[in-house]
From Swiss-Prot:
PANTHER family: TRYPTOPHAN SYNTHASE ALPHA CHAIN, CHLOROPLASTIC, TRYPTOPHAN SYNTHASE, ALPHA CHAIN. This is Tryptophan synthase alpha chain. GO terms for molecular function: tryptophan synthase activity. Keywords: Amino-acid biosynthesis, Aromatic amino acid biosynthesis, Lyase, Tryptophan biosynthesis. Belongs to the TrpA family. Pathway: Amino-acid biosynthesis; L-tryptophan biosynthesis; L-tryptophan from chorismate: step 5/5. It comes from Helicobacter pylori (strain Shi470). Tetramer of two alpha and two beta chains. It holds the Pfam family Trp_syntA.
Amino acid sequence: MRYKNMFETLKKQEKMAFIPFVTLGDPNYALSFEIVKTLIASGVSALELGFAFSDPVADGVTIQASHLRALKHASMAKNFQLLRAIRDYNPHIPIGLLAYANLIFSYGVDNFYAQIKECGVDSVLIADMPLIEKELVLKSAQKHQIKQIFIASPNASNKDLERAAMHSQGYIYTLARSGVTGASRILENDASAIIKTLKTFSPTPALLGFGISKKEHIKNAKGMGADGVICGSALVKIIEENLNDENAMLERIKGFIGEMIS
């Protein structure tokens, strides 16, 4: 319901969704909470929060470093605790999780979905789980009313795009390019054909991710037919560059978000 309300409100305002990604516990749990509070106060549409993992294969160097910083003190219990705190802090903002399959399967699929539901999470995207394996999680996602998000990639067949569109709830994570995460100077690929194809299969909003780091990228994404963007590496880079100055970090995050959504 939170995603539905968000997209309906944005549509009335003729605005794009802007969803930031950060890793929970980076650089520590207390500051991670302050970062999330700053993001919310800066007017982001929703949150995409990562669980730190030792082998984040879908991520480039910036977010890999973020995982490593968080792993120094990360635990599933602390992740859940912070998620609860975020949900208590703001009951309305959609919260999405980005996790790697191993974390979910080692915890127990149904246990994991039950736990995140209790924490107030709205959606889950499993970074390294192909669509073909969707049945391993869909039953638990539906049982616990968690929206399962799937990825639509530039090299996907029409059949795979149809599956991603039909099974994704909340939104479809559409890749601006293949490869791993990372901020780009320019959006190299035109995702308009993929987005157009997705929209023939489902009305579920398509969000563009991978490489979003400038205001003009959001304009480009809008021109491609996307309903919003997900921005990770450019934001995580600000965290990395200001590890020794918490106030400067939060101010720079605030400035960056303001610039992106103005």
